[in-house]
């Protein structure tokens, strides 16, 4: 891929993308302070919301479902075979258990890391389900696995964050920002009233004003200009209240010199946010305000247009 072209190449029919992290548009910056590196042009296979061990959690809730650990792992390796990338980036919620994973989930993660690091290096961007990830990696004694802070990481020209909390400023200043967490889907209705739910990509200009307002605030927990209120003592997850309109009315011009890409969930058992159903709010504290002109794409590449009007 030539510098200046789209750095995000969704893999057809798959909830994964090849991301080229080389600096673009004359921007040579590369973050090494938060686990980034300076290998410009590295191509990474990026997936979000793998949720290893999900079936364990479902069984605890009384839902009998066999483990899909081997299937998940084989799907990922098949994508590596197809894309021939040099690195895998997990865009948060690689694990499913919040906190310390149990033995079955830990074993799935260890086998996954062992098989992946025989082929590529691995970056785990911490999500809200990845609290015990450093311990898993340390106990397994596996090299070539890097776990980032929850604020995300910038690799070359691309910022990566899970999306459950506010990313670091250098992450959101990247020309392209990738997040997960939402498991975005659309509910589609056919001509006879039948309905189905499809996973999607959300892509559009990144409106940086909510991040600017947060940086400029007096750290009092309120970003009044963008209609976002963060309760004291939270990181900005599901409990955040927001106006939910995505409207630019009465606000200064958008600062949209970058792109935001919301990844579909890799694990197809986790459900998702119906982004075209007004009653379903976003989970991320900075959506939909930072993606007011976002468009939806099916996994086969079909462009659906404005996600709110699908």
Segments from the language model and where they lie:
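Acidic, His/Gly-rich catalytic cores of divalent-metal-dependent hydrolytic chemistry
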Residues: 189-310
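Short, conserved loop/helix-junction motifs that constitute active-site signature segments
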Residues: 113-118, 170-173, 255-256
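A contiguous pocket-lining binding segment that forms or flanks enzyme active sites
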Residues: 139-218
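Active-site-proximal beta-strand elements of phosphoester/diester hydrolases
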Residues: 43-51, 157-164, 177-179, 261-264
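Zn-dependent metallo-beta-lactamase
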Residues: 1-43, 308-310
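Core catalytic region of metal-dependent phosphoesterases/phosphodiesterases
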Residues: 45, 54-155
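Active-site environment of divalent metal-dependent phosphoester hydrolases
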Residues: 53-55, 96-98, 128-136, 166-169, ...
């Amino acid at each position: 891929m030539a510098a200046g072209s789209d750095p995000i190449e969704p893999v057809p029919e798959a909830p994964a993308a090849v991301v080229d992290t080389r600096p673009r548009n004359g921007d040579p910056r590369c973050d090494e302070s938060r686990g980034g590196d300076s290998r410009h042009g590295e191509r990474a296979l990026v997936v979000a919301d793998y949720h290893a061990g999900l079936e364990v959690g479902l069984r605890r809730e009384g839902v009998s479902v066999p483990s899909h650990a081997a299937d998940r792992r084989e799907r990922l390796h098949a994508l590596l075979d197809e894309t021939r990338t040099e690195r895998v980036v997990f865009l948060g919620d690689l694990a499913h258990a919040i906190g310390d994973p149990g033995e079955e989930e830990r074993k799935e993660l260890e086998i996954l890391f062992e098989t992946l690091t025989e082929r590529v290096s691995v970056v785990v961007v911490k999500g809200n389900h990845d609290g015990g990830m450093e311990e898993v990696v340390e106990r397994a004694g596996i090299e070539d696995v890097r776990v980032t802070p929850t604020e995300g990481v910038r690799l070359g020209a691309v910022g990566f964050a899970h999306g459950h909390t506010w990313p670091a400023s250098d992450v959101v200043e990247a020309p392209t920002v990738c997040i997960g967490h939402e498991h975005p889907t659309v509910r589609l209705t056919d001509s006879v009233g039948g309905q189905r739910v499809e996973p999607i990509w959300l892509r559009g200009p990144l409106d940086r004003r909510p991040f600017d307002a947060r940086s400029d605030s007096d750290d009092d927990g309120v970003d009044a200009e963008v209609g976002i209120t963060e309760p004291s003592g939270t990181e900005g997850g599901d409990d955040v209240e927001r106006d939910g309109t995505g409207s630019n009315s009465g606000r200064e011009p958008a600062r949209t010199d970058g792109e935001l890409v919301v990844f579909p969930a890799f694990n197809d058992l986790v459900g998702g946010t119906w982004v075209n159903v007004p009653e379903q709010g976003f989970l991320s504290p900075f959506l939909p305000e930072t993606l007011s002109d976002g468009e939806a794409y099916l996994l086969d590449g079909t462009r659906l247009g404005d996600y709110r009007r699908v």
